[in-house]
Amino acid sequence: MKKIVILGAGIGGLSVINEIRESGVPLDDLDITVVDEDFAHFLGFTLPWVMRGWREADSVPIRPSAQALSGINTITGSVTGIDPIARTVTLSDTSTLSFDALIISTGARNALDKVPGLAESAARGDAVHYYSVAGAGDARRALANFSAGKLVFLVTSQPFRCPVAPYEGALLASDLLSEKDVRSNVDLSVYTPELHPMPSAGPYAGPQLVQLLRDNGIAFHGEHRTERIDPDGKVVVFADGTTVSFDLLVFVPPHEPSVTIEGSGWIDVDAETMQTRYDGIWAIGDTAAVTSPSGKPLPKAAIFAKNGAKAAAQNVLRYLGRSDRGGALSGLGYCYLDTGQHRAAQGKGDFFSLPHPAITLTEPSSSQHHDKQDEESQWRAMWESRSGA
């Protein structure tokens, strides 16, 4: 009996389960265990909807049913360590799991303390984010009560989950303020360390998005690396010494991997197989660091967690001698960008193309917003339904 351990039951981990089931490989002699802190996850693109007021926070979590996870061992707990030599995983209750193959899909977590003053500003209510369910609820309340002044959207550091999220958030905030008939009272801007939005998408989508921001009266300021926040003065201080004041700050939190191997930092993987430098260990999704053929980092986005799961699952089965077929990570990806008024644009293409990706944005439409809604509905039905995945 070969033991497969999957860390994380989010989009990546669940996709691994689905890929193994659909592989056609007999599962009788495979012992599959998935570990997760609470077996509740969400699609990241639903959080801006909560901030905008289109969804309630408690409607966002997706909890896989027992039927959907039938035949899979489930352990609720946190991972505190991985020993790649002994091939064991240590959990918060000090118990250990041994494995023949390990797939790490634990994602990224918010790390506000990495920027001095940020946590204090958030505690005071002057700074909010929408990178967690609770955070999105806080941002919703803050924007609902905001009617005049300087509203600053800030990308505190790179990398971060969902490349379009900061700009989508600014567009939806503008949409909300217009709906409240107070948009003319608000100075709305975005600051980011990026040269332009979506740099991993190539040279075209970013300028398109900047123009979309400008069309909505949102100022874009690239190449601004955050140094610290002054909570008393309500000021962002950048690395070059420049500053911007705010009445309300909506920020993308600093990110760090939820789980890593032997130290800290994102887990480097082979850009084709998703295998780490350790035999029998793969990493996928947000926790993995993938460099595309053009030298750009692969975005931390749900589609690439799914693509990585497909490649890793096939390679695990081959590694365990259950299949002759390996898998390679696909660079084909897409994302939707809500622009307001229940309309969305889409960026889609091959992030592995050379000499660089050539992603462009489509014109916003209501049909693309509905497509985005359908994507969540289909994923939710797959895992919450009685029929399972």
Predicted segments, located by residue:
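C-terminal auxiliary extensions adjacent to catalytic cores
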Residues: 345-389
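Short glycine-rich anion-binding loops that position phosphate/pyrophosphate groups of nucleotides
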Residues: 12, 40, 107-110, 255-257
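Beta1-alpha1 glycine-rich phosphate/pyrophosphate-binding loop at the start
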Residues: 1-73, 157-203
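A Rossmann-like FAD-binding core segment of flavoenzymes
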Residues: 29-33, 70-86, 97, 175-271, ...
